[in-house]
């Protein structure tokens, strides 16, 4: 569970960021997230998972596949299809903004 100050950091990069829970799993919903150069589309909706999901300590899910990252996969979360890639070992003990930055590195 993220604290208010950590959510505020994420709101600086994605205004309207909020915490959402589904089935005991906590996500940070990022309504608009700018992606690194070369991704298409270059802005997407995202879910940042700050706890283990599918064998990864943290995950970043995107509303659209972006043509970057290795071993892409899709997952049904909150009744929608979300896309991610294999980018592991980003620890949950980082601040959420740091977790987000590390996941975005996987798309560069």
Q: What function would you assign to each model-found segment?
A:
Residues 3-4, 49, 95:
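General structural signal for secondary-structure boundaries
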Residues 1-41:
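Strand-helix-loop interaction patch of compact alpha/beta domains
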Residues 30-77:
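Compact alpha/beta protein-protein interaction domains typified by the UBC
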Residues 6, 42, 56, 96-100:
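Amphipathic alpha-helical interface surfaces
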Residues 61, 71-108:
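Glycine-centered motif in EGF-like
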């Amino acid at each position: 569970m993220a604290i208010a100050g950590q959510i505020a950091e994420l709101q600086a990069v994605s205004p309207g960021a909020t915490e959402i829970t589904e089935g005991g799993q906590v996500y940070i919903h990022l309504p608009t997230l700018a992606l690194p150069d070369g991704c298409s589309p270059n802005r997407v909706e995202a879910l940042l998972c700050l706890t283990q999901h599918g064998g990864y300590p943290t995950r970043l899910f995107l509303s659209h596949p972006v043509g970057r990252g290795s071993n892409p996969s899709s997952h049904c979360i909150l009744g929608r299809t979300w896309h991610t890639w294999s980018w592991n070992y980003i620890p949950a003990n980082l601040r959420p903004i740091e977790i987000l930055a590390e996941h975005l590195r996987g798309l560069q």
